[in-house]
Amino acid sequence: MADLVTYSNADHNLEQALITLKKGTQLLKYGRKGKPKFYPFRLSSDEKSLIWISSSGEKRLKLASVSKIVPGQRTAVFQRYLRPEKDYLSFSLLYNGKKKSLDLICKDKVEAEIWIGGLKTLISTGQGGRSKIDGWSGGGLSVDASRELTSSSPSSSSASASRGHSSPGTPFNIDPITSPKSAEPEVPPTDSEKSHVALDNKNMQTKVSGSDGFRVSVSSAQSSSSHGSAADDSDALGDVYIWGEVICDNVVKVGIDKNASYLTTRTDVLVPKPLESNIVLDVHQIACGVRHAAFVTRQGEIFTWGEESGGRLGHGIGKDVFHPRLVESLTATSSVDFVACGEFHTCAVTLAGELYTWGDGTHNVGLLGHGSDISHWIPKRIAGSLEGLHVASVSCGPWHTALITSYGRLFTFGDGTFGVLGHGDKETVQYPREVESLSGLRTIAVSCGVWHTAAVVEIIVTQSNSSSVSSGKLFTWGDGDKNRLGHGDKDPRLKPTCVPALIDYNFHKIACGHSLTVGLTTSGQVFTMGSTVYGQLGNLQTDGKLPCLVEDKLASEFVEEISCGAYHVAALTSRNEVYTWGKGANGRLGHGDLEDRKVPTIVEALKDRHVKYIACGSNYTAAICLHKWVSGAEQSQCSTCRLAFGFTRKRHNCYNCGLVHCHSCSSKKAFRAALAPSAGRLYRVCDSCYVKLSKVSEINDTNRRNSAVPRLSGENRDRLDKSEIRLAKFGTSNMDLIKQLDSKAAKQGKKTDTFSLGRNSQLPSLLQLKDAVQSNIGDMRRATPKLAQAPSGISSRSVSPFSRRSSPPRSATPMPSTSGLYFPVGIADNMKKTNEILNQEIVKLRTQVDSLTQKCEFQEVELQNSVKKTQEALALAEEESAKSRAAKEAIKSLIAQLKDVAEKLPPGESVKLACLQNGLDQNGFHFPEENGFHPSRSESMTSSISSVAPFDFAFANASWSNLQSPKQTPRASERNSNAYPADPRLSSSGSVISERIEPFQFQNNSDNGSSQTGVNNTNQVEAEWIEQYEPGVYITLVALHDGTRDLRRVRFSRRRFGEHQAETWWSENREKVYEKYNVRVSEKSTASQTHRDRDEEEEDIPH
């Protein structure tokens, strides 16, 4: 059941309680036959009857016939299945002259208080203010304002009720709570954090049930909203449904305790789910921002929730809020009528026409309209230019705000970039300023986009029959990019400009997105303009340059409401159906997936709901549905899968929420179900409740592990040992006494509200020591056992969640007394010191754990990065290796092909292919470039050859001759350089390699003058190249124009040949060389002397 939010106004609190009763809940009903069963109970709209749906149909109990309300399990019907542990959650309504009773058990303590207090108020009012609650002194449930309200969780709500003589007119009076200010986000309460309930003669405390303390922002339970008659709409309550990217109460802690920061997570809700609130609300209007939302109830109260940033929630505290929370500072002074949310601020309009703003003002001087960049954490009224004006509505963009007065005057303020304020310039306005170009005209609607604004302005139109009527025309201004202004171009407009393409239509509502504008005519037609991305225009044929009509499924519908998110649109028709289209990320369209929709598509999950209002946030959507009570037909089908019960599909009740489910949807069991007879046994729960209870169990286990006795340091261990020695003398008897009390309480199986941890100054220390020894602090705080017999033997009295007078002896319940317990003062002091030591050790160990965890996370990230880099390097190496292998194979193949071609040439055929395309000759040598410079690979090859062949030897054709003189070398070099261009295929490759290499060589100096002349004649030389005959032997050949070849020189490697070895080799292999290369041989081929020319060697060999 929902928790109470406290107010200072008694009428508000009474109305809040009645709203809760009208919405109803699942209660466990006892009968005269059979076992107890779950039924939905609610209060009728006229507040005169109590209605529930049983297996035989709807039943009613008129409150006028109820003569008495009896808390506890005292009737004979309860005795059939007595559950003492649920005594404080039970009550009975006696009617028909106390002859019959309606016996019920509530889910938790707060729910019981609301039902008992609300029914008591109605019965007392109906019977002249005479109280009918047994044991109550005629007063209602009220609050002692002088007492301090306590809570064990930041998000919990507590109330203190006093048993006094309050007037019947104000029976349900609860004071507001001031939550502690903290920079940490609001952490959901857990089962281990439930405060112990202390009862005395004057006060009691209420706390949210542990089973409901851990909640997600949206509920998985199906709502009972459905279509109803128009006559009931005024009395129906408003439920909020929400879908898209929604804030979740799973908080992630980053860093160690000293520098810890908290990250609030968000979850994607793909279909509409009812918003789960800590209170039961009647929502009238809702507004959605980027990371927060707000709504206004029918009672004029404003609630906000979401991620806190600069005070935009208005609670005055710097922490996130997961469930709607009352903005107390504004509700206490004014009744709110309208609310709007921007990205960093929030605006609210009261019934008195006052405008309040709050939020982060540091982003822009004029964002809040107060003339400064100061952030306001609570609502602040805007005066100045609005003094004396009645504000009717307001619209918020990320950086500017627009408002309309009751007389239709339009004011804007904030950042004026792109002329978004409509004042004819781009200046920032710090206070609300009227748009002068629309002065004298009545503005009926306005909407703020990111950098553009749109408004509907009434224009007097003269008809053909000379009559004048007012018609709403669409005006836009600001940034014209993406055609969002609808003027057919992308130019900005600094002042409001009427959209000419829509001049013939009568508009009355407008909405703006990021790059989108949507208008609604009085005839129910929807026009869109702007970017076509994600299909947000809802028309497949448009290019977005001009406004287009949204038809398709809306062609036969009458649209009543429209709303825009950043990139999606929602429309509400007259048949209360919701259509959405545009971007589908995060499930913001509500169709159960993440797909975009380019045409309007109905939201099936809301098809059987009566929707009365819609609102879009940046990436989520919300709707207000009229709440209708569960019908008999809905009781005959599963609350989750909506399938009807039958012979094979049996119905089961969830022991946590009480709703009916089939076996498939409630096949799991869990401990600590709210409506379970025993918390220590497994009971059937639905799937959604199982998830919630599992989370609570996990948190409890974590808390138990954290509360275990830590390993002590040396200094603290010595201190603890000394304390144990002092306690050993007399501590045994006291611990035995506590164990005996626990064993008796376990047999009795009851909980007490009077055995409080805060009642006696000595008992808390004993209990704390016991918790430290048993490593079970959380369990001890959650359930302090009730004793069956008081040690002092005093007379027992009844115990109930409400403080009241003694009941008759027959219904008395034993209560413990602490008067018989006595412990020396030294024990309490020693246990306090021990507890402090343990707490210090826990803090140290937690700090170490957080530090090590953080280091481990960093190292894991670094390891992942290293592995990723290694994989990338291996992939790159493998790729390069594959390329290298392929290149080598290609080279080998080309060389083999070239050799085959050379072998096939007939004798005497000139060789035309002196080099390959890649610059390699047949033997793999690289030719230099045309400019005389060699490539790097050629240079390396040339250098290698030069290093192994440093000697030059000259020879005559078929004979040895004198070496060339040094002065002949330049001529030979010149001759060689001039011979190469004769072949066009060699001209691109430059001179041959022999120009740079003049190693151990023989020159062909034939005595045949004609032969020598033929070689030296540059006109007869066609090509020259070098070939390797065998390792260490390099042959220089010349191709002549007549098709013959001549041998120019032979070079030998110094590493393989000496001077005489080279001469010997040549004399032995000369004929073979001539025969192999088909070189003409001179008739005079006698060898001549050979000598070594050192000067030529030094000149030709490169250094």
UniProtKB/Swiss-Prot annotation:
Sections of the chain in a coiled coil: 828-904
Alphabetized InterPro entries for the sequence: Brevis_radix_dom, BRX_N, PH-like_dom_sf, PH_domain, RCC1/BLIP-II, Reg_chr_condens, Ub_ligase/GEF_domain, Znf_FYVE
Gene3D superfamilies for this protein: Pleckstrin-homology domain (PH domain)/Phosphotyrosine-binding domain (PTB), Regulator of chromosome condensation 1/beta-lactamase-inhibitor protein II, Zinc/RING finger domain, C3HC4 (zinc finger)
RCC1 repeats: 237-298, 299-351, 353-406, 407-458, 471-522, 524-574, 575-626
Low complexity bias: start-end ranges: 151-169, 217-231, 791-818
Tissue: Mostly expressed in flowers, and, to a lower extent, in stems, leaves, siliques, seeds.
Domain PH span(s) in chain numbering: 22-123
Region (Disordered): 144-233, 783-818, 962-988, 1079-1103
Zn-finger (FYVE-type) residues: 632-694
Binding site for Zn(2+) 1: 638, 641, 662, 665
Polar residues biased stretches: 962-979
The BRX domain, residue ranges: 1023-1078
Function per UniProt: Binds to phosphatidic acid and to phosphoinositides such as PtdIns3P, PtdIns(3,4)P(2), PtdIns(3,4,5)P(3) and PtdIns(4,5)P(2). Catalyzes guanine nucleotide exchange on specific Rab proteins.
Protein name: PH, RCC1 and FYVE domains-containing protein 1
Native source species: Arabidopsis thaliana
Organism phylogeny: Eukaryota, Viridiplantae, Streptophyta, Embryophyta, Tracheophyta
